[in-house]
Amino acid sequence: MNYGKRLAGIALGAALISGAAVEAAVPQDALVVGGIAYGASESYVRSVYGAPREVETKYNPLYAGGQATEWEYGNDFDIVFVDGAVRQIEISARNGVQTAANIAVGTDVNTLIAAYGQPDVIRGDQYIYFVNGDSSIGFVFEIEANRVDEIKMGVIR
């Protein structure tokens, strides 16, 4: 009987360990692109990057109140704010902007996986990493020819 309990305990432990190893564990404080964290204020972004080249209002039921403000800095670097806080950053060019783990457009997919682990979801050419299992926020890396072609950080649509 004692043997049975040990065997059951070992099996349970192995199942828990293997289940935890499957998910990428991206902590929320890793949601940083170009030195700007998820939730940063408009004033902080302005202090780092200055005034945006263009400002647009976006309408989407996904956003609180149905709208967001997008700041475009040029060179395919855009920041979306909802209620004055960063909710998404998008980079789609080799412009030197990178994540806190040094992943930028042009980075090899193996370097991406070494930095963040296996993605939580692969949807077509997108490698998706959730923050602590929350499928509403994280990173989406678009992969083309085994390289990062686009980075989205924040709200996942």
Regions of interest found by a model, annotated:
Residues M1-I10:
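Bacterial N-terminal signal peptides that target proteins for export
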Residues I10-G19:
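Bacterial N-terminal signal peptides
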Residues A20-V26:
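Sec/Tat signal peptide C-region and signal peptidase I cleavage site
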Residues V26, E42-V82, A104-I156:
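A cross-family detector of function-defining hotspots
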Residues D29-I36, G96-I103:
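Second-shell loop/turn segments in exported
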Residues A85-Q88, S92-G96, V105:
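A low-complexity, Ser/Thr/Gly/Pro-enriched, surface-exposed linker/loop concept
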Residues I91-N95, K152-R157:
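Short, solvent-exposed aromatic-acidic interface loops
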